[in-house]
Regions:
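Extended, low-polarity segments enriched in aliphatic/aromatic residues
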Residues: 2-53, 57-61, 71-80, 85-374
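Terminal amphipathic helices with adjacent charged low-complexity linkers/tails
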Residues: 66-67
């Protein structure tokens, strides 16, 4: 497969310009106007942020993309699917309220918001996964599959299970219905290290399945109830919750790539990633820790695999922020440095597996040419 082209622009803005101007210029340079959108429904997949989290992308960026689509005669809408876990996005009504409270509405974004898998997260379509090894079919939000054109607008950040979240995670995990998310997470279930557990009960508060109780002030997981979503792993500040299946995160990564294939295959698709506010964990948390790396810039491509690879490469070249989760880990006496910012921030991740699987099944290539736009 030939190299894909990834376009990049940094966040420097001379007086009289703005980041929104640069985003539009980036999208145009990357070829978004080559897509015939006239009279067609355009799904713009993004994350509206959990209430309390402030690292998610601002609605202004969504409006910039929606405006480009409308200029081309498209009928854009913002979309995401419901979550497995507790919080403010587990059904469509709460999800829409969350989006509004975080600034996403028809005025701020210039388009409608549709929750992709409906009221309860059950409005899904079973879609074949071309070349799928782990998933022969994927359960994708109905509204997302109904769209003629698919665009992803992603915030690049760290992630406690997948290493980082970029385009492929936004597409693969994000477009899965609640059952689809469960299918991806089913590779392994967490365990408790009782020697480290403080009995703080934070993991139980994050569990959407009521699977965690306490015996003698130590967490206990009911595996009949546990869905394997991994929220408890990210919730624990003491590393008491872990995944005993060393291959579980890798399988999750590979399933996620196959779900992304199901979403993109057979229709025009285009992808944008903003590498800023690079928090160590997912925007699904009701908080965001300090960034582990400095802001880098905006990337766009027709190839989500090359796009994520380019974003990851840029992050790996960046200097860690000292006062961050990554910086603290690197300064710990005896810390085993992986020379990999994502693994040094969250040691149990296997992020390269997502890119490897996505390339293997033909979604894109990890080989790319980077073109900088001023």
């Amino acid at each position: 497969m030939e190299k894909s082209t990834v376009y990049f622009t940094d966040f420097r803005c001379p007086v009289g310009t703005s980041q929104l101007d640069k985003l539009k210029k980036l999208c145009v340079a990357a070829g978004i106007r080559d897509i015939d959108m006239d009279g067609k429904f355009v799904a713009i997949k993004m994350h509206f942020g959990e209430l309390g989290n402030l690292a998610f992308l601002r609605p202004n960026y969504a409006k910039a993309v929606a405006d480009i689509c409308k200029e081309q005669g498209g009928l854009p809408f913002l979309t995401d699917c419901n979550t497995l876990y507790p919080g403010s996005r587990k059904n469509a009504l709460e999800h829409l309220d969350c989006a509004n409270l975080n600034g996403f509405n028809t005025i701020t974004t210039g388009c409608q918001i549709i929750i992709g898998d409906g009221l309860r997260g059950t409005d899904e379509i079973e879609v074949p996964v071309v070349n799928g090894e782990y998933c022969k079919t994927a359960l994708i939000g109905h509204a997302i599959i109904d769209a003629d054109i698919f665009i992803s607008l992603s915030h690049f950040k760290g992630h406690e299970a997948t290493g980082f979240g970029g385009a492929l995670k936004n597409i693969g995990m994000g477009c899965g219905s609640r059952a689809g998310k469960m299918q991806q997470h089913a590779s392994g279930k967490p365990a408790i290290n009782e020697e480290v557990c403080r009995g703080c009960k934070r993991c139980a508060k994050e569990c959407g399945s009521d699977a965690i109780t306490y015996v003698n002030k130590k967490a206990v997981i009911d595996y009949d109830k546990c869905k394997g979503c991994g929220r408890c792993i990210g919730a624990c500040s003491f590393d008491a919750v872990y995944n005993p299946n060393s291959s579980a995160n890798e399988i999750l990564d590979r399933k996620m790539a196959e779900y992304a294939q199901a979403v993109c295959h057979g229709r025009p698709h285009f992808h944008i990633v903003l590498v800023q506010d690079i928090s160590p964990n997912c925007d699904c948390h009701g908080e965001n820790d300090a960034p582990i790396l400095p802001d880098i810039g905006m990337f766009a491509s027709f190839d989500p695999v090359a796009l994520d690879q380019a974003c990851a490469d840029a992050c790996l070249k960046a200097t860690p922020i000292e006062n961050s989760q990554l910086g603290e880990h690197l300064s710990e006496p005896g810390w085993h440095c992986h020379h990999d910012h994502f693994k040094d921030s969250n040691p149990n991740v296997e992020w390269k597996a997502t890119l490897d699987q996505a390339e293997k099944i033909g979604l894109g290539t990890r080989e790319y040419e980077l073109k900088k736009i001023k």
